């Protein structure tokens, strides 16, 4: 698997755009998978084996839809899901190589990826459009208002303080406007 990811990364790293007025980069889940952000196999086992054993969840994506009994369990899952996909650099430098390939050109990125690896690699934030949201943001589950909220500090605390696949109740995020539980920003 690693050899295949490395080979794919090298292929992406050798792409050189032809002269053009502008470059539009379209990217989906395949780019992140090539960068090593896989949702199954060894990576899933490393971070989520306890959830697999208790709930029979088979991969990271499917776990996002699991009907956990408590918000403490829900946020234990999601804090790991968010952290290991949004706040950790991709293991294979696909995004870095893509940035090198378009450096000095007028580019724009349109992506369905929600883990913001483009920003982590140094792509200009003003040249990115994430059609399906951002793992780094929460929003009201009732949509009582349009604001989103950065979650990094709380996600890191949830990760540090969780035990037995639960976060402490005081870390469960609630909407500051209506009091409903917060939810993820991705819009799938």
What is the role of each PLM region?
Residues 1-188:
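Conserved catalytic core of sirtuin-type NAD+-dependent deacylases
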């Amino acid at each position: 698997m690693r050899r295949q990811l490395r080979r794919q990364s090298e292929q992406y790293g050798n792409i050189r755009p032809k002269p053009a007025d502008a470059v539009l980069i379209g990217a989906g889940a395949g780019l992140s998978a090539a960068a090593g952000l896989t949702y199954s196999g060894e990576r899933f086992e490393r971070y989520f084996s306890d959830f697999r054993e208790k709930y029979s969840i088979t991969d990271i994506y499917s776990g996002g839809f699991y009907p956990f009994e408590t918000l403490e369990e829900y946020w234990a899952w999601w804090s790991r899901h968010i952290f290991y996909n949004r706040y950790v650099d991709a293991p294979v430098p696909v995004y870095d190589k893509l940035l090198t390939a378009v450096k000095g050109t007028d580019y724009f990125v349109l992506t369905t990826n929600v883990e913001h690896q483009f920003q982590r690699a140094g792509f200009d934030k003003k040249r990115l459009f994430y059609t399906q949201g951002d793992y780094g943001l929460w929003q009201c589950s009732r949509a009582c208002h349009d604001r989103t909220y950065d979650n990094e500090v709380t996600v890191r605390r949830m990760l540090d303080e969780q035990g037995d696949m639960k976060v402490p109740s005081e870390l469960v995020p609630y909407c500051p406007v209506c009091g409903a539980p917060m939810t993820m920003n991705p819009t799938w």
